[in-house]
From Swiss-Prot:
Pfam families: Ribosomal_L18
Family annotation (HAMAP family): Ribosomal_eL18
GO-annotated biological processes: translation
GO cellular component, one term: cytosolic large ribosomal subunit
Family under the similarity heading: Belongs to the eukaryotic ribosomal protein eL18 family.
KW Cytoplasm (keyword) present: no
Name of the protein: Large ribosomal subunit protein eL18
InterPro entries associated with the record: Ribosomal_eL18 (IPR000039), Ribosomal_eL18_arc (IPR022947), Ribosomal_uL15/eL18 (IPR021131), Ribosomal_uL15/eL18_sf (IPR036227)
GO MF terms, alphabetically ordered: RNA binding; structural constituent of ribosome
UniProt keywords, alphabetically: Ribonucleoprotein, Ribosomal protein
Gene3D superfamilies: 3.100.10.10
Superkingdom: Archaea
Gene responsible for this protein: rpl18e
Length: 121
């Protein structure tokens, strides 16, 4: 018998369901990819420092982090970052650089097609 992989966090379970539904409705693979990453064990979630965001992002770009954004390093580009959660230091550094920190749910409602977004892990 296999064990069901249900998430005990109701917000996360609803987010995964919403990501899969939006992926099917809009025929976009990016949301199903994010959902499959969030369905995995929590120890496999992405933990991205703002220095990595600074290294790979250009001004005005939208990035998705299927995990947590941490505050180590500096960010110079004003980017929009959507993630499952943010540390307090990461939020302050991104907003100081004229960027935005939004939840994955907000990005999903703003951009259901997932156009011009990149996954960072």
């Amino acid at each position: 018998m296999t064990r069901r992989n249900d998430k005990s966090n109701p917000r996360l379970a609803e987010l995964i369901r919403l990501l899969k539904q939006t992926s099917r409705e809009n025929e976009v693979e990016i949301w199903s990819d994010i959902a499959s990453r969030l369905e995995k064990s929590r120890k496999n979630y992405a933990e991205v420092n703002v220095s990595k965001i600074n290294r790979y992002a250009q001004e005005g770009e939208t990035l998705i982090v299927p995990g947590k954004v941490l505050g180590s390093g500096v960010v110079e580009a004003g980017v929009t970052v959507a993630a499952l959660s943010f540390s307090d230091a990461a939020v302050s550094k991104i907003t100081e650089a004229k960027g935005q920190c939004i939840s994955i749910e907000q990005l999903l409602s703003q951009n259901p097609k997932g156009s011009r977004t990149r996954i960072l892990r």
